[in-house]
């Protein structure tokens, strides 16, 4: 009877390993009380249809009360491991109580046959005794052999009740034979059985399954299982981004997350038959401090994940920007001087993710050392090394470089740097014993070793030798050596860049940049980066380039301009590393100005000669120009996926080529006329379908700057567009050209010029769903305007190329210019992508007005939060101030917009009056304000 089961329910729960240590469990759920209540419901309503709503109401009440108790305890004490085990205990009680009721009253069988007896088994995370607040529960209904009608009825009844309670239930109905057969064929099912946990029933089937599983599935298949789980892990990392340092990490499946710890435990359980990570200490697989680190990392990750579930009210594993601050606050990370609480929290998260990686690496290395996983090495090289007992003071042990003794680094601190150098030079991995010896001896990396010329020589060779520095420096960073040897670098380890533009932490970004630099030099990126791949082989100061990439962001997070502060770091550090005075000066200059080339290319008008001349006066030499180009490309490429595109490549190439021309004596005042003549001559060849009269008429339309703004092919397309419009006397002509190579669409508009045209066109393009990344504005001698916009798709970047969208774009322009549509009205309907996520970032509005950047224009730079219609609002403000916009540079960096306008006043002159400048600043700051805020 159900009442008999109820009498021992709470006592049996106390024996469960996963829930034995939960204090005052009955405050979460008393199974005895619940069972008595269900017995009462059966007495009141019978077992028919009337019972169902009352049963669901009582079970839902038990769930809600229990969840509230678990949440209250969690928010008071903040232990994620306690939370997931208490949630598991609650789910266990509900499932067991429902099973008791179903088999006792709904489908009773006084004397069930052997085929009607079954066990219920928890699998997945639920099987481990871990259940996050909104996670699924996975159940296995374990049968002796084939299904019977009664078993099917019980399973169906239970599942429908659980689903009606709002629980997400994954389930399987299998016999013991099914489980064994499918476990052999499918590693996912094998893993589910491996971490299964008895939940309800007579237990005989569960014990039979575990005995057969160990004997028939696990025995002799260790290497196969290890390979499968590690391949599964590697594929998961590739899918989510193969880095632990993405700024919106996945707490469960991301690199360094809970799944990596679980993978480690699955392998340990499979190979060593352990039930707890602490058991691996006795097996001499992990050291006590490593097992302690496992427990700390797991509790931190579970705590963050439980907070994430409670904050979002759903099963959610990605820690997006909009929840990071709240989770950090709940976990006790407050603002300190110069550092936000969220930055401290995320730094701790990244350090935990790094610890998880260290544990996984040590564990897997130990497996390989015991030949439980086939090694993957260069066999010929290892055979040669194996014949040498001593390799630069180390030994080859199990195809890895090992220390002679655990005290080697304490006796010879220099060997800690030499170990990585030797591993790099011989393309060999490092033995886990050596990694452990490093961990125990990190204190030897102090002032004395940092001042050792030989240590610095070895480090500089690691960084600037012909072997890939990223691999070795990553090993040094993961081991904690890099931060100790270069303390300034230690300050940026796990340092997040709290915005939506940067994807990685500062140290991870830096290591990626070094890897990209090496690939450029090795010719591995020639197709993608032809100019950099050519230029790098002309570089003389090769060592300075590699050191500059290592140091370019080393002063981030200190407050102040990280370029200036970083240059000071370089001036002190480079001599220590062994660089000459000339190399030190070059490195410091590159760090100081590492943003100058991208700033000029992306935010200044490259057709303005003064832009190029000012840049050249800063750079001064062809060698610095080459160094700065390669550094800039590696830096941008390493920011994150999608941050580099062909449009940026085009602008950098144009700036490089024009700067090189100036340095070789080009771009002189006298030469400008010759360049215009050359451009017009090239256009003449392009326009073979124009007769002489047509060609001369077209030449008369353009002012000098126009002929230098485009190549001959583009000028030819525009000439045909202009001629067609003038012949047909159309009020407006719109032409689009998709350039997939540069991932942009070029929109050319030829229309009657009037005040405010650019602003209205910007509004029309934004309303059509286009992001404007560049604009060139020309007034022709006949009073017509030829405006060329470079756009991308606002929905996902890339070229704006959908047929429907292009058609909408043309219609939108026509309607706006004809007055049929107001851009402002349409734009208010559009929301910025990721609006809720960007809201957490504060982007101070800023307006900078520069009358020195151009000889003919006032240059206005505007910074603020990006949103749909921002460019329209800004240009409308400038138009209302009777300013003429000659050109614009539009850039977005995550949530931040940086727009630059070249303007003149109504008389065609620079704006110099202080009152007018103040008015411009005030109006633009007003336009930067988000109307939806």
Curated annotation (Swiss-Prot):
Cite the residue spans of the region called Uridylyltransferase. 1-390
Q: Where are the transmembrane segments?
A: none
Q: Where is this region: Uridylyl-removing?
A: 391-745
EC number(s) per UniProt?
2.7.7.59, 3.1.4.-
Q: Where does the ACT domain start and stop, copy by copy?
A: 746-829, 859-933
Q: Which segments constitute the HD domain?
A: 506-628
Keywords in alphabetical order, please.
Hydrolase, Magnesium, Multifunctional enzyme, Nitrogen fixation, Nucleotidyltransferase, Repeat, Transferase
Which is a GO BP term held by this UniProt record? regulation of nitrogen utilization
Substrates-to-products reaction catalysed = [protein-PII]-L-tyrosine + UTP = [protein-PII]-uridylyl-L-tyrosine + diphosphate; [protein-PII]-uridylyl-L-tyrosine + H2O = [protein-PII]-L-tyrosine + UMP + H(+)
> What are the names of the required cofactors?
Mg(2+)
> Which domain of life does the UniProt lineage start with?
Bacteria
Q: How is its activity regulated?
A: Uridylyltransferase (UTase) activity is inhibited by glutamine, while glutamine activates uridylyl-removing (UR) activity. Uridylylation process is dependent on ATP and 2-oxoglutarate, which are effector molecules that likely bind to PII proteins and control their activity.
A single GO molecular function term of this UniProt record: [protein-PII] uridylyltransferase activity
Q: Which InterPro entries match?
A: ACT-like_dom_sf, ACT_dom, HD/PDEase_dom, HD_domain, NT_sf, PII_UdlTrfase/GS_AdlTrfase, Polymerase_NTP_transf_dom, UTase/UR
Q: Which PROSITE patterns match?
A: ACT, HD
Q: Which Gene3D superfamilies match?
A: 3.30.70.260, Beta Polymerase, domain 2, cca-adding enzyme, domain 2
Free-text domain note: Has four distinct domains: an N-terminal nucleotidyltransferase (NT) domain responsible for UTase activity, a central HD domain that encodes UR activity, and two C-terminal ACT domains that seem to have a role in glutamine sensing.
Q: Which family does it belong to?
A: Belongs to the GlnD family.
Q: What does this protein do?
A: Modifies, by uridylylation and deuridylylation, the PII regulatory proteins GlnB and GlnZ, in response to the nitrogen status of the cell that GlnD senses through the glutamine level. Under low glutamine levels, catalyzes the conversion of the PII proteins and UTP to PII-UMP and PPi, while under higher glutamine levels, GlnD hydrolyzes PII-UMP to PII and UMP (deuridylylation). Thus, controls uridylylation state and activity of the PII proteins, and plays an important role in the regulation of nitrogen fixation and metabolism.
Protein name in UniProt: Bifunctional uridylyltransferase/uridylyl-removing enzyme
């Amino acid at each position: 009877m159900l009442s008999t089961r109820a009498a021992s329910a709470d006592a049996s729960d106390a024996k469960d390993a996963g829930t034995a240590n939960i204090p005052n469990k009955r405050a979460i759920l008393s199974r005895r009380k619940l069972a008595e209540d269900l017995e009462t419901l059966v007495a009141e309503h019978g077992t028919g249809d009337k019972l169902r709503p009352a049963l669901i109401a009582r079970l839902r009440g038990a769930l809600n009360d229990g969840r509230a108790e678990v949440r209250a305890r969690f928010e008071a004490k903040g232990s994620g491991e306690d939370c997931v085990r208490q949630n598991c205990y609650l789910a266990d009680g509900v499932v067991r109580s429902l099973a008791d009721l179903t088999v006792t009253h709904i489908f009773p069988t006084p004397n069930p046959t052997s085929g009607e007896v079954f066990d219920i088994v928890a699998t997945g995370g639920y099987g481990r005794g871990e259940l996050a607040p909104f996670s699924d529960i996975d159940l296995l209904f374990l049968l002796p052999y084939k299904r019977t009608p009664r078993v099917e009825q019980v399973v169906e009844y239970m599942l429908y009740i659980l689903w009606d309670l709002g629980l997400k239930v994954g389930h399987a109905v299998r016999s013991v034979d099914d489980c064994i057969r499918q476990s052999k064929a499918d590693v996912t099912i094998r893993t589910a059985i491996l971490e299964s946990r008895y939940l309800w029933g007579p237990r005989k089937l569960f014990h039979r399954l575990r005995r057969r599983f160990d004997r028939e599935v696990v025995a002799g298949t260790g290497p196969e299982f290890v390979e499968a789980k590690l391949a599964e892990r590697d594929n998961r990392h590739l899918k989510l981004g193969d880095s632990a340092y993405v700024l919106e990490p996945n707490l469960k499946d991301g690199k360094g997350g809970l799944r990596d710890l679980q993978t480690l435990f699955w392998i340990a359980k499979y190979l060593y038959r352990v039930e707890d990570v602490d058991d691996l200490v006795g097996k001499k697989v992990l050291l006590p401090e490593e097992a302690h680190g496992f427990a700390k990392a797991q509790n931190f990750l579970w705590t963050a994940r439980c907070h994430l579930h409670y904050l979002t009210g759903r099963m959610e594993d990605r820690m997006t920007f909009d929840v990071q601050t709240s989770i950090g606050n709940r976990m006790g990370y407050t603002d300190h001087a110069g550092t936000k609480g969220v930055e401290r929290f995320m730094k701790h998260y990244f350090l935990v993710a790094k610890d998880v990686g260290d544990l996984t690496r040590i564990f897997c290395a130990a497996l390989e050392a015991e030949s439980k996983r086939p090694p993957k090495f260069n066999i010929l090289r290892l055979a040669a090394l194996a014949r040498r007992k001593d390799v630069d003071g180390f030994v080859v042990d199990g195809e890895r470089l090992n220390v002679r003794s655990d005290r080697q680094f304490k006796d010879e601190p220099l060997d800690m740097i030499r170990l990585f150098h030797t591993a790099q030079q011989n393309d060999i991995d490092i033995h886990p014993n050596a990694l452990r010896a490093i961990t125990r001896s990190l204190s030897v990396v102090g002032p004395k070793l940092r001042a050792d010329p030989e240590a610095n020589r070895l480090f500089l060779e690691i960084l600037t030798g012909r072997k890939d520095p990223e691999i070795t420096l990553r090993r040094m960073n993961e081991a904690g050596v890099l931060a100790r040897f270069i303390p300034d670098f230690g300050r940026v380890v796990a340092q997040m860049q709290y915005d939506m533009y940067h994807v990685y932490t500062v140290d991870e970004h830096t290591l990626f940049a070094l890897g990209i630099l090496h690939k450029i030099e090795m010719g591995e990126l020639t197709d993608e980066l032809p100019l950099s791949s050519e230029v790098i082989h002309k570089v003389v100061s090769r060592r300075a380039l590699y050191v500059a990439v290592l140091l370019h962001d080393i002063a981030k997070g200190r407050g102040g301009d990280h370029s200036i502060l970083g240059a000071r770091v370089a001036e002190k550090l480079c001599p220590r590393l062994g660089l000459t005075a000339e190399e030190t000066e070059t490195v410091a200059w590159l760090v100081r100005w590492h943003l100058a080339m991208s700033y000029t290319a992306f935010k200044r008008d490259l057709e303005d000669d003064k832009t190029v001349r000012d840049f050249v006066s800063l750079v001064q030499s062809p060698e610095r120009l080459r160094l700065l180009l390669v550094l800039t490309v590696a830096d941008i490429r390493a920011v994150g996926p999608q941050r580099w595109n062909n449009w940026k490549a085009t602008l950098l190439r144009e700036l490089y080529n024009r700067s090189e021309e100036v340095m070789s004596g080009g771009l002189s005042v006298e030469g400008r006329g010759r360049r215009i003549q050359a451009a017009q001559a090239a256009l003449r060849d392009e326009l073979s379908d124009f007769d002489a009269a047509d060609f001369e008429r077209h030449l008369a339309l353009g002012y000098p700057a126009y002929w230098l703004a485009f190549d001959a092919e583009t000028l030819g397309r525009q000439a045909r567009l202009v001629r067609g419009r003038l012949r047909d006397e159309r009020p407006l002509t719109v032409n689009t050209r998709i350039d997939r190579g540069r991932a942009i669409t070029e929109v050319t508009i030829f229309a009657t010029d009037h005040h405010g045209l650019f602003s209205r066109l910007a509004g029309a393009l934004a309303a059509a769903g286009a992001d404007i990344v560049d604009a060139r504005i020309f007034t022709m001698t006949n009073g017509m305007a030829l405006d060329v916009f470079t756009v991308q798709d606002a929905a996902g970047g890339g070229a704006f190329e959908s047929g429907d969208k292009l058609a909408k774009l043309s219609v939108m322009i026509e309607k706006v210019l004809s007055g049929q549509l107001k851009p402002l009205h349409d734009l208010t309907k559009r929301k910025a992508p990721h609006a809720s996520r960007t809201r957490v970032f504060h982007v101070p509005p800023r307006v900078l007005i520069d009358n020195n950047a151009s000889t003919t224009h006032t240059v206005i730079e505007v910074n603020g939060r990006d949103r749909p219609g921002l460019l329209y609002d800004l240009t409308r403000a400038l138009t209302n101030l009777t300013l003429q916009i000659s050109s614009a540079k539009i850039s977005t960096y995550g949530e931040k917009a940086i727009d630059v306008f070249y303007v003149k006043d109504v008389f065609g002159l620079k704006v110099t009056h202080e009152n007018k400048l103040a008015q411009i600043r005030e109006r633009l700051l007003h336009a930067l304000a988000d109307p939806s805020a």
